[in-house]
């Protein structure tokens, strides 16, 4: 699947979940298009990549589609996670309740700062990095979340790779490239913010150009 399609799947899942909670039982691609601001043809094309899910002229069963996309996203089972880095971002992620509702269960949080050892963040106690490997093995950790400086991210990722971890959600300011067996999602929060400022700048430039055109037409 293309990266664009993979990026749309969580949006489909989120919107369908809201429709299900609102008691909507069936929806057409046109109706979903109006809600999500994605063309109806794109929606049908996306769903056809996974078998279609609906019938022409009949639409989609919301609950069924929600469950099937959840399976594609791997949300039909729970995932055990750890956070490495107990700073502001790590603590914010640990405190975010919605992860648990999606089946993402935080089992531990680690840091190399002795001042944080033993600190409780929700029901997690900050542990030293020396205990990382043992904890990962004993608790069958699937995913590690890195909220640490980029200087130490690669070393920590390689330590995790040796423990047969399945995936890394990386917030460190470095793109990690590990073996094919380990899935890595590199997240740069500033990238999203820069996309926003690009769109603001493009909109403002468009207004400036249209104002200049109107001015020239008036003189």
Could you say what each language-model-derived stretch is?
Residues 17-20, 124-208:
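Phosphate-bearing ligand-interacting subdomains
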Residues 26, 30, 35-78:
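HTH-adjacent hinge/linker in prokaryotic transcriptional regulators
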Residues 86:
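Glycine-rich Rossmann-fold phosphate-binding loop(s) that bind the pyrophosphate
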Residues 89:
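Hydrophobic/small residue at the entry helix of a nucleotide-binding pocket
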Residues 100-122:
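NAD(P)-binding Rossmann-fold cofactor-contacting core
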């Amino acid at each position: 699947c293309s990266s664009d399609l993979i990026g749309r799947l969580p949006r489909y899942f989120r919107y369908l979940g809201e429709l299900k909670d609102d008691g909507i039982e069936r929806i057409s691609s046109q109706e979903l298009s109006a809600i999500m601001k994605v063309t109806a043809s794109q929606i049908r094309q996306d769903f056809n990549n996974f078998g279609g899910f609906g019938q022409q002229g009949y639409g989609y069963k919301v609950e069924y589609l929600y469950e099937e996309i959840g399976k594609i996203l791997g949300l039909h089972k729970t995932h055990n996670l750890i956070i490495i880095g107990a700073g502001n971002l790590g603590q914010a992620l640990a405190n975010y309740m919605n992860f648990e509702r999606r089946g993402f269960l935080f089992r531990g949080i680690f840091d190399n700062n002795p001042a944080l050892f033993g600190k409780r963040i929700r029901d997690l106690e900050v542990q030293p990095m020396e205990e990382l490997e043992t904890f990962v093995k004993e608790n069958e950790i699937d995913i590690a979340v890195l909220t640490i400086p980029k200087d130490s991210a690669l070393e920590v990722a390689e330590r995790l790779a040796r423990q047969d971890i399945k995936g890394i959600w990386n917030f460190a300011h470095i793109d990690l490239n590990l073996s094919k067996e380990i899935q890595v999602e590199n997240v740069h929060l500033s990238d999203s913010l820069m996309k926003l400022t690009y769109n603001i700048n493009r909109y403002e430039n468009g207004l400036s150009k249209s104002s200049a055109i109107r001015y020239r037409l008036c003189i």
